[in-house]
Amino acid sequence: MLRVAVPNKGTLAEKAAQMLREAGYRQRTDPKDLVCRDDANNIEFFYLRPKDIATYVGSGDLDVGITGRDLLVDSGAPATEVVDLGFGQATFRFAARPEDIDTAQDLDGRRVATAYPGLVERHLAELGVKADVIRLDGAVENAIRLGLADVVADVVETGATLRQAGLVVFGEPLLRSSAVLVCRSAAQPHPQGELLLRRLHSVLVARRYVMLTYDVPADLLARASSLTPGIESPTVSRLHREGWVAVQAMVLRDDVHRIMDELYQVGARAILVTNIQACRL
């Protein structure tokens, strides 16, 4: 049975559970449950603190897990990113008082407060910068005001919290993070693990694409199908109406309205969009 670590709370937890449901797996119904068995799919889910997941997977106690890339790097665990799951995006940045520090090279000899000491120390080592990294569990923005640190390093989404504390970001991002599936670095392939990966890929494709169908005169098919080439090729069927065909093709969700506009200008009609629940390419 495949043993999978899943975040037990927060935005990663909600979106990870939703993705697993879309992939056809049973998930817990009570947020207090720590384990959920899906015997039909020969898989067992363990709900853990996101920060601990890479450690459990890296030790081999669990086979795979879903966590943030930032948490994976910070853990230093012997675990490897398998696939980016496309949610939980965040950027990890340095911040300080305005005009105090301009670049990461200016951190030499400074005090840096963060909840991600492993990530920060690794980044500074790559830059050849020596700084005093101070570990905090949260609310690092106050560390500068209270005199504990000169700089903070934290996940930044909008930057509003930093601005409220009178801080500004500087330098290049340390890391661009998102939710990822991880496995033990030296792990042997697991049949159920490979199936889980295929199913997650299926959900990712379904979220990225939609199915577009339309009717078009046969003499305009070449122009219309050039807008909708599909993955391999569009599906074309003759209609009862003489000289017309129906076309079906997958298109990128982000492009669908532009493509619909262009198809209509070409002469296509009855243009419909259908969401894809799952897809194997």
Curated annotation (Swiss-Prot):
Query: From the Swiss-Prot or TrEMBL record, what is one GO molecular function term?
Result: ATP binding
Name the GO terms of the biological process aspect: L-histidine biosynthetic process
Judged by the first EC level, this protein's enzyme class is transferase
Localization in the cell: Cytoplasm
Chief subcellular site?
A: cytoplasm
Cofactor(s) for this UniProt protein: Mg(2+)
Which pathway does this chain act in?
A: Amino-acid biosynthesis; L-histidine biosynthesis; L-histidine from 5-phospho-alpha-D-ribose 1-diphosphate: step 1/9
Keywords tagged on the record: Amino-acid biosynthesis, ATP-binding, Cytoplasm, Glycosyltransferase, Histidine biosynthesis, Magnesium, Metal-binding, Nucleotide-binding, Transferase
- Say yes or no: keyword Coiled coil present: no
Q: What are the record's GO terms for cellular component?
A: cytoplasm
Record field: catalytic activity:
1-(5-phospho-beta-D-ribosyl)-ATP + diphosphate = 5-phospho-alpha-D-ribose 1-diphosphate + ATP
| Parts of the chain that traverse the membrane | none
Q: What is its EC number?
A: 2.4.2.17
Q: Which domain of life is it from?
A: Bacteria
Q: Which family does the UniProt entry place this protein in?
A: Belongs to the ATP phosphoribosyltransferase family. Long subfamily.
Query: What name appears for this protein in its UniProt entry?
Result: ATP phosphoribosyltransferase
Its organism's taxonomic lineage begins at: Bacteria, Bacillati, Actinomycetota, Actinomycetes, Micromonosporales
Per the record, the gene is hisG
